[in-house]
Amino acid sequence: MSLSPINQTNLFSLDNYLSEFVELYKKKRLPTKILLSGDKGLGKSTLAFHLVNYILSINEEHPYIIKESKINPDNKSYKLVINGSNPNILLVDTLSEKKNIDINQIRELINNLNKSSFNNKERFIIIDNIETLNISSINALLKVLEEPPSNTYFILINNDRFILPTLKSRCINFKISLDHKTSILVINKILDSDIMKFINKDLLNYYLTPGQIYYLIEFFKIQKHDLKDYD
C-alpha cells in the first residue's frame, strides 16, 4: 500500500479545510499563492491534490464528489495525474537521490510556465517540502511569485520547518492540524484496522500524524518486530 498523495482518492478528516478552499474558489477569492503549513504526515499534499481535482474536474463527466470529499477515479483529470500527463498540474518535490529542491528543478518549472496552456483551465503548481529549497531555488521562485502567469495557482507545502520570511510573505498561510485522537482514527481508516491492537500506546504518543504512524508500522513490518514490545 502506498500513501503517495497523488494516489489518494479519499481525504480523511481534512474536509473542513477543503470546504473552506472550495467556498473561496466559488466566490473567486481563492488566493493564487497558498502556503499549507503543518506537521509532516497530516495529508497536506493530499489536500492540495483534492482541491486541484475539484477545480479541474468541475465540468468533466465524472467530477469530484464533494459530499464525500472524494476524487472520482473515473474523472479525466485524475487519470492524467496518475499517468503524469496532466498539463494543468506541475509538481515539484525533492528527487529521491537528493535532499534539496535544486535550482534546475525551478528553472524547469519556469520553462514550463512560459509555455502556452493546452486549454483554458487553471494551472496549478504544487511544490512539496518547500523547506528543502536552497537559496538559489528560493530566489528563482520568488521572481515567479512576484509576477505569476495569469490563471495560475501556486500551492506551497511546508512541514512546519523554517522558511525564509520573504518567501512566506508572498503567500497566504493556512495552518493545517489534526489532534492525536483524530490522527489515530484516520490511520485506522487507511489500514482498515484498529492499530491499538498491535502497537504500544506509550510508543504511539511519540507519533502525532497519520503519516508518521503509518511509516512507523511499515518500518516495523519490514524489520519483523512486534510493536507491542516497544514503549
Task: Name these PLM-found stretches.
Residues 97, 132, 147, 162:
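Residues immediately C-terminal
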Residues 95-103, 130, 173-174:
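Flexible beta-alpha connector loops of hexameric P-loop NTPases
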Residues 19-25, 75-81, 100-124, 132, ...:
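Conserved alpha-helical scaffold flanking the Walker A/P-loop in AAA+ ATPase domains
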Residues 57, 115, 146-147:
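Conserved amphipathic alpha-helical interaction elements at protein-protein interfaces in regulatory
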Residues 124-128, 141, 152-158:
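Structural recognition of the conserved hydrophobic beta-strand(s) that form the central parallel beta-sheet
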Residues 37, 91-96:
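A short hydrophobic beta-strand->loop->alpha-helix junction that borders the nucleotide-binding pocket
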